[in-house]
């Protein structure tokens, strides 16, 4: 009897132990898979305590879109360089037209994927899954808001001012994390700051966007300490806690351990924002290069025609014969190629939904397309790097951008560090009150300078540079 009792107790303990281990495993598993119901939230950042469900024609995500369209930072994109110099007699893309086109493609991707997912998961019909298109569309509008003047060369100019220029002298005065933010300055991280930071005199939560829209623009969900050679990261040290709050609310998987620089998996909709951007900049840069005669008509047609199957080519060629205008032919081919890419990226997302939700999917959707379409896209990329991004006009913009931005940063940082100097007072008086140039820390002061300069248009930055150098005076 004693042996039987001991045996029963052992069995009972083992059963309890097994149940405990099994429950822990289930808990870990549930934490390592994101779910759509939690990922799509219309809660507004900064107004959580006042969250209410409004029964009106516009959804919260459509409100995000409208809020961005009517904002001053969005309007300023019309005077910021995309790739080519801002238009003379030939109109090419600027940041505003690019963002609007990315938003359209993002909406198409989102709507197509929402329809496929609802068919695949009918149990989610009562969720916000059908609104993916609206979320992605709004996030696409916002994706370039943080970019400084003069295109990507503006980003490089800010980073290299601190890593190679006069700003290097400030390194001993800043923490390692603060220094990484400055030397790896990133437009995506700056967009997240612009949308969430409470600037002087503004309401808490910045733009007060929905959690899902904000999460969808964070392409690199980790801190600057993990930026590496690609110089990419998703949020500055000052907004790290804000992103953590959003990630936890939406159930985004945390990949870093306690004590390590933070890293999260991407919100699934980031892949759609990224794909829309990849599709638009590549396809539109080719068309712009044709308008500027950097690429011949034959070269341009050959690049676009690679995207179509033989059966589709027959119809494409028939339609092109009906159009006499060469630019219209190119526009039609570009539109058709974008359609092919949207369909291909939609298929990749739906096929890899499980890996995307558990945070193991790697690379952009573009890299996972079927080989013929992927090869056609890569051929466009190779041509762009060989002939477009190294063209004289593009390089001239980079050279001018470096000079203008580094000069402005140098003078403004000197001014906020020594605000009692006479010249410093003149410079600081030009800065809008919303920028915290009198912040208590050096990091805060530098961020205020970068907020001010990154918000400038190309024309404003150039005009200020000329005035500071005495090359331009206001009309009397």
Q: Model-flagged regions — what are they?
A:
Residues 63-75, 369-373:
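Acidic, low-complexity proline/glycine-rich segments
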Residues 319-369:
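Long, amphipathic alpha-helical stalk/connector segments used for oligomerization, subunit docking
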Residues 429-467, 471:
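C-terminal amphipathic alpha-helical interaction region
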């Amino acid at each position: 009897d004693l042996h039987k009792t001991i045996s029963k107790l052992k069995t009972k303990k083992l059963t309890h132990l097994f149940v405990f281990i099994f429950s822990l495993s289930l808990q870990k598993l549930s934490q390592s898979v994101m779910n759509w119901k939690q990922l799509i939230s219309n809660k507004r950042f900064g107004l959580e305590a006042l969250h209410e469900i409004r029964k009106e024609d516009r959804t919260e995500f459509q409100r995000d879109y409208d809020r961005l369209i009517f904002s001053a930072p969005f309007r300023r994109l019309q005077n910021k360089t995309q790739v080519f110099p801002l238009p003379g007699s030939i109109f090419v893309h600027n940041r505003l037209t690019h963002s609007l086109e990315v938003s359209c493609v993002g909406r198409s991707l989102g709507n197509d994927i929402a329809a496929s997912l609802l068919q695949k998961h009918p149990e989610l019909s009562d969720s916000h899954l059908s609104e993916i298109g609206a979320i992605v569309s709004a996030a696409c509008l916002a994706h370039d808001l943080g970019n400084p003047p003069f295109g990507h060369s503006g980003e490089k100019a800010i980073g290299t001012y601190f890593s190679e220029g006069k700003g290097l002298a400030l390194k001993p005065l800043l923490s390692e994390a603060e220094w990484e933010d400055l030397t790896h300055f990133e437009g995506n991280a700056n967009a997240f700051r612009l949308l969430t930071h409470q600037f002087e005199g503004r309401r808490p939560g910045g733009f007060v966007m929905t959690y899902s829209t904000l999460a969808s623009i964070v392409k690199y969900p980790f801190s600057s300490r993990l930026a590496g050679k690609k110089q990419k990261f998703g949020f500055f040290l000052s907004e790290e806690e804000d992103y953590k709050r959003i990630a936890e609310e939406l159930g985004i998987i945390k990949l870093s351990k306690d004590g390590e620089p933070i890293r999260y998996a991407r919100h699934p909709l980031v892949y759609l924002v990224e794909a829309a951007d990849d599709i638009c900049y590549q396809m539109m840069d080719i068309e712009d290069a044709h308008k500027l005669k950097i690429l011949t008509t034959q070269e341009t047609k050959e690049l676009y025609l690679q995207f179509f199957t033989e059966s589709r080519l027959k119809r494409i060629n028939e339609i092109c014969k009906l159009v006499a205008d060469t630019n219209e032919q190119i526009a039609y081919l570009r539109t058709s190629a974008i359609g092919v890419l949207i369909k291909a990226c939609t298929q990749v997302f739906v096929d890899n939904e499980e890996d995307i939700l558990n945070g193991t999917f790697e690379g952009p959707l573009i890299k996972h397309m079927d080989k013929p379409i992927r090869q056609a896209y890569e051929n466009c990329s190779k041509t762009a790097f060989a002939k477009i991004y190294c063209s004289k006009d593009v390089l001239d913009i980079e050279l001018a951008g470096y000079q203008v931005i580094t000069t402005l940063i140098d003078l403004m940082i000197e001014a906020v560090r020594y605000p009692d100097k006479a010249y410093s007072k003149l410079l600081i008086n030009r800065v809008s009150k919303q920028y915290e140039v009198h912040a208590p820390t050096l990091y805060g002061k530098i961020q205020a300078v970068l907020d001010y300069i990154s918000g400038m248009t190309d024309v404003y930055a150039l005009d200020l540079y000329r005035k500071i150098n005495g090359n331009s005076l206001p009309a009397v």
